[in-house]
Amino acid sequence: MFTGSMVALVTPFKNGAVDWQSLEALVEFHLENGTHGIVPCGTTGESATLSHQEHDDIIRAVIKSVNKRVPVIAGTGSNSTDEAVRLTREAEKSGADGALMISPYYNRPTQEGIYQHYKKVASAVGIPIIVYNIPGRTGSKIEPETLARMAEIENIAGVKEATGSVDQAIDVIRLCGERLAVYSGEDSLIYSLMALGGRGVISTCANVAPKQTAQLTEACLKREWDKGREIQFQLIPLIRALFIETNPIPVKTALSLMGKCSGELRLPLTPMAEGNLKKLTQAMRDFGLLKG
């Protein structure tokens, strides 16, 4: 199963279109700096503003660039079950190693509806699916008991926990045990969740600090807890700055400041407020990502 630091990759744009050259360069940046897996077309990848064709093309491009060096876990979630099936089948056909599927948003299904949604998609494909539990975006939380039921479904292999609740993670790990891998969806809780038995992180912070995020997960997997705690504490000011506005506004801005890609966003996302930009820039300087 997937372990370590898996980056929730941004989607670089140039003049309104996907910047394919920068996308390939970002993949190489991660592979050179120890990232353990690439996750395109998630929340950080602005999947909500991608066309269906762009979504499929980005996943194919990332798979081609990675060339089997690390796993590619494609974002394939939708609030339409049939659309989630289509996206996941297409990702599997393209060679994705797994899929990350956000819980249905806006229509706010019941726990039974969430269960049936994932069951239908899992039965339609042969690649492992990581459930994405982020109630702040979806409007509904997947309860630990529901995840325990889902852990019995073939191909449901893990959950990205972005509830921000350590109690939630404890209950999921307690109820599911080895049947369901748990990944942190909060960069500030990587150490905490891995100390409880989590397998890694699907990370926004890794976009700009891939080496340090990978080192943190490696330390935890080796049970080098003092080292892991030290790295987590070092990352905290940067993590807070990266979430000073809606993700991925700050992280794309940070990558632009680093010269990795443009900071271009698609509406309804807009550039950072000047005061927040100054705070982000200072945090990046303090961490050593920028000079001066």
Label for each model-derived stretch:
Residues 50-53, 86, 111-114, 142-144, ...:
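Short secondary-structure transition/capping segments
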Residues 23, 55, 59, 84, ...:
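A general structural signal for well-ordered alpha-helical segments in protein cores
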Residues 33, 57, 61-66, 90, ...:
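Alpha-helical structural signal in soluble globular domains
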Residues 4-12, 29, 33-35, 195-198, ...:
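C-terminal alpha-helical cap/extension of soluble enzyme domains
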Residues 123-124, 137-243:
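Catalytic alpha/beta core domains of metabolic enzymes, predominantly
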Residues 1-7, 11-141, 290:
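Active-site beta->alpha loop and helix N-cap motifs at the rims of alpha/beta catalytic domains
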Residues 133, 155-156, 266-267:
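Glycine-rich phosphate-binding "P-loop"
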